[in-house]
């Protein structure tokens, strides 16, 4: 599973702390995000995103726009248990994952840019932080019918 999200991103009209997608292009600037599913864990999915543009909160906003908020992203609704059952055991599991990863599940694996003076292309790679890796391992071990 993979796809592309296109839509202008600008300041949310009612909540100035959030950004929003304006598909009609009436606000903001053009933004393009390519995504690819890496692994599915029942109620959450690990994805890789590649950006063509660089807008504020781009991944967070585009993922929310297509109905897939980032795990534990309080600003955009990913801190809510939106999918799955309402069983106490599931809620307890998710709350435990929130405590393991007390921030939005977002990591810049690769950053690259052209140096402003030398013109040399610089690329930096980084492995997943321990908290994200621990949360992923918890989801790998979770069975939907627990």
Task: Name what the model sees in each region.
Residues 1-146:
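RNA pseudouridine synthases
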